[in-house]
């Protein structure tokens, strides 16, 4: 119920179009999954590491410049969606990209840094013009005098970016990017949909490292998932030392993933409502469960089956990792100096 009212509130704040970034997440999976397959089959740099967490990217550029070739070249979902808005969507609507102002509402403070990167521009035009956090959005709604609880429930704008899948939904929890990618990689390797759609091996919201070895049509894919930079350091040092056994690694800067991002509302731990149940359930657990529940409720749960994603490639991009896709949806990284290694506290 909150989502519909949030959409209504944003329209009353002055936004002319409101889209769900889950569409961008589906697009990211198409590009990232294809990139991974290319590296696996063509002798590319492995392990490949996810690139959608800007806090992690910042850490890598300062502390692990020698490992930057391991990072996926894919932009993060909201940057990809911004690039599509200012290219395909602008073209479809006869609007000059320079006249479009894209604002991303994010759970992450580091997204403000990400959108300023020169590598996140196309022909000098930024994919995203401004980033506000979920906490800042709540403050804007309150200060504008909008009576949130009395708002009607409204839906996202549909046109060319209204559809999204369960795979896009689970991006927000640690392990979600990995699972979403594996659903599509499985299909591309086998030509069939996985009967049991979930990959329980990579699920969990806790900070730390999880690993799994998956046999996909005779191809063994070793994967690791971690959130929090302390855990990431362990995996990165293994790569440096030449002892890493993985093909694909997901790294999230925030323990638990984006659900625990630095821009999210402050919430204390709470007990489950059932008074007979004394199990402590934290807000991270509740948010993770909410995303997995929404994934299960989706009719379509694999990014490659999103009809609007299919249409976008047919009419505009050509195919994943095409020349046009690389121009719009991929980025690059550069080693930087001036920062000592970041000390983090995982909660």
Region spans (language model):
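Iron-sulfur-associated redox domains of electron-transfer enzymes in respiratory
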Residues: 1-347
């Amino acid at each position: 119920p909150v989502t519909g009212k949030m959409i209504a509130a944003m329209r009353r704040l002055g936004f002319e179009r409101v889209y769900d970034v889950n569409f961008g997440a589906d697009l990211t999976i198409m590009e990232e999954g294809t990139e991974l397959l290319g590296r696996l089959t063509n002798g590319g740099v492995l392990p490949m590491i996810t690139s959608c967490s800007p806090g992690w990217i910042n850490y890598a550029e300062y502390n692990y410049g020698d490992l930057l070739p391991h990072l996926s070249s894919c932009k993060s979902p909201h940057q990809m969606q911004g690039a599509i808005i200012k290219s395909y969507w602008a073209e479809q609507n006869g609007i000059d990209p320079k006249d479009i102002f894209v604002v991303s509402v994010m759970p992450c403070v580091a997204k403000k840094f990400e959108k300023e990167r020169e590598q996140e521009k196309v022909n000098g035009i930024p994919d995203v013009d401004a980033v506000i956090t979920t906490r800042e959005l709540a403050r804007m709604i309150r200060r504008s005098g909008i009576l949130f609880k009395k708002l009607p429930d409204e839906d996202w704008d549909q046109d060319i970016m209204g559809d999204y899948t369960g795979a896009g939904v689970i991006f927000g929890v640690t392990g979600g990017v990995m699972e979403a990618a594996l659903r599509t990689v499985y299909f591309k390797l086998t030509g069939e949909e996985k009967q049991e759609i979930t990959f329980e091996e990579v699920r969990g919201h806790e900070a730390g490292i999880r690993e799994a070895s998956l046999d996909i049509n005779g191809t063994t894919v070793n994967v690791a998932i971690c959130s929090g930079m302390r855990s990431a350091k362990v995996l990165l040092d293994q790569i440096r030392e030449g002892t890493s056994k993985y093909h694909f690694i997901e790294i999230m800067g925030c323990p638990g993933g984006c659900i625990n991002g630095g821009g999210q509302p402050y919430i204390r731990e709470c007990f489950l409502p059932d008074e007979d149940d004394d199990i402590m359930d934290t807000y991270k657990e509740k948010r993770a469960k909410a995303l997995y529940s929404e994934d299960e409720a989706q009719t379509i749960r694999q990014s490659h089956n999103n009809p609007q994603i299919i249409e976008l490639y047919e009419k505009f991009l050509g195919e994943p990792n095409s020349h046009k896709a690389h121009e719009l949806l991929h980025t690059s990284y550069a080693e930087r100096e001036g920062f000592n290694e970041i000390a983090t506290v995982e909660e």
